[in-house]
Amino acid sequence: MLKTLLAVIAAGLIFTANAATLFGTAIDKTAAIPVEQLLVQPASYLDKVVTISGKIDSVCSKQGCWMKFTANSEQGPFRIKVRDGDMVFPLSAKGKTAYATGTVRLWPQGEDEADAYQLYPTAVEIAD
């Protein structure tokens, strides 16, 4: 009996350790484009719904209200932003692969800086 219980607990831990963290609805990962592809011509995606994939570079340490995908471009990293409390991204997500579906919008910068782009997601999946 004890061996069976331990086996069930071990199996549960293995499956839980590899489970993705999902915010919002399920994501169609087959439609995902790499964040670098979006950043080649971000204006062409403005106000459109897209699904992107990338590695998480950083996460908001105060309220978990944004995270940034690593991007090898002049515009990177690329920010994923939600209203405070809508989704709370865990600090442990840093370095993991993620997928996000949402609308690309302008992100106003300072007076002497060009505006950047960010994604307002309806769904996010932190995969590994």
Would you name each region that the model predicts?
Residues N18-D128:
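OB-fold and OB-like single-stranded nucleic-acid-recognition modules
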Residues T4-L13:
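Sec-dependent N-terminal signal peptides
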